[in-house]
């Protein structure tokens, strides 16, 4: 607990405390399953470092990339959705070449949601999908379709159009996922349990409009794969 409060204090100090960042990244990467099975130290270090007002929330200038990668990979496996969500700031401050070593971990964090903090768990998954689409990473298409079907129903009528907008950035390349999108549209319209009927139709219509746009698209971006 003292280490957690210490991290919060360092974040509050700001620039004069930046010399402590290497050690904080090192601590974030450490996992103590016996004494801290829920990763609470890691959780609060993530906030202190990567939140909007965190020590690295606005810039990664001067940060050792190897240490950063190790910490991010560990943080993306934290059990808390909000802790994972804070790491999204890293995605926005790295070039494609810089972020390539993190792509497998980013993809895994999309497919495997945090088991707790469900209210915040979607944030890092959508952020990851947006990143993969921005760089036309092929695996992003199937990950997006999977997430569309498995997403938390709460606020999914708002999230689904956002997901479809991301998918459209793949242009006609997204035709490979049209059959699965059609199945999901049918599910949304007819079979989704415990969800308002009108919102079910709304989501289904959103997918059908996306399918039509994909089929009409002439944009064919070059895709790359996660290595």
Question: What do the predicted segments below correspond to?
Answer:
Residues 167, 185-189:
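Short leucine-rich amphipathic alpha-helical surface patches
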Residues 1-16, 36-62, 81-97, 118-137, ...:
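Structural detector for internal amphipathic alpha-helices that build alpha-solenoid repeat scaffolds
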Residues 15-31, 55-75, 96-113, 137-150, ...:
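Amphipathic alpha-helical scaffolding segments comprising HEAT/armadillo-like alpha-solenoid repeats
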């Amino acid at each position: 607990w003292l280490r957690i409060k210490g991290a919060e204090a360092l974040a509050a100090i700001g620039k004069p405390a930046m010399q402590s960042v290497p050690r904080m990244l090192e601590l974030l990467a450490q996992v103590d399953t016996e004494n801290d099975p829920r990763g609470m130290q890691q959780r609060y270090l993530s906030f202190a470092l990567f939140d909007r007002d965190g020590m690295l929330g606005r810039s990664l200038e001067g940060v050792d990339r190897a240490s950063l990668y190790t910490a991010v990979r560990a943080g993306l496996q934290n059990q808390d959705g909000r802790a994972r969500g804070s790491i999204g700031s890293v995605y926005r401050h790295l070039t494609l070449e810089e972020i390539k070593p993190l792509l497998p971990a980013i993809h895994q964090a999309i497919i495997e949601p945090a088991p707790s903090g469900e209210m915040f768990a979607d944030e890092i998954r959508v952020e990851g999908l947006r990143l993969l689409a921005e760089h036309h990473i092929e695996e992003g298409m199937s990950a997006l379709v999977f997430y569309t079907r498995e997403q938390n129903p709460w606020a999914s009528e708002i999230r689904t159009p956002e997901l479809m907008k991301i998918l459209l950035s793949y242009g006609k390349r997204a035709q490979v996922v049209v059959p699965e999108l059609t199945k999901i549209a049918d599910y949304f319209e007819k079979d989704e349990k415990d969800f308002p009927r009108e919102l079910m139709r709304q989501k289904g219509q959103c997918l059908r409009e996306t399918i039509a746009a994909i089929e009409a698209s002439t944009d064919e971006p070059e895709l790359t794969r996660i290595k």
